[in-house]
């Protein structure tokens, strides 16, 4: 079964905790480093539609909303823990990438760029689990 490549519109339309299966969520210290990371990902073969870029100011309100509206049962799981972690990073000015990584080879390229550019987090979402890449 193939995994759908998400768009910004897809993500805007989802509610509750973030769970972009087949994608990796990355945070960088600011928007400038995030832009550099997006360029680096394109340089290692990631297509433009595979890399969604979010400025800190774009991500912060949505993360606040997601944390505030997460269901009660989500409050005890790893997903809401990640959302709270993401919110803290966004409040500190982090920029964000959501990268399509359905295959291990793509995740390896993302991990290399994330490590080289000092990503604050890199979490790959699978169907049944999440994986910290750095």
Question: Can you name each region flagged by the protein language model?
Answer:
Residues 1-134:
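Positively charged, small/polar-rich N-terminal and surface patches that mediate targeting and assembly
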């Amino acid at each position: 079964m193939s995994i759908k490549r998400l768009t910004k519109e897809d993500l805007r339309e989802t509610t509750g905790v973030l769970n972009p299966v087949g994608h990796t969520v990355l945070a960088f210290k600011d928007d400038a480093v995030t832009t550099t990371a997006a360029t680096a990902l394109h340089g290692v073969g990631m297509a433009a539609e595979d890399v969604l870029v979010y400025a800190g100011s774009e991500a912060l309100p949505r993360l606040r909303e997601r944390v505030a509206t997460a269901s009660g049962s989500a409050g005890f799981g790893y997903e809401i823990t990640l959302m709270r972690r993401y919110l803290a990073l966004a409040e500190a000015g982090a920029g964000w990438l959501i990268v399509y990584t359905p295959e291990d080879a793509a995740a390896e390229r993302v991990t290399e760029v994330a490590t080289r550019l000092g990503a604050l987090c890199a979490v790959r979402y699978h169907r049944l689990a999440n994986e910290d890449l750095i």
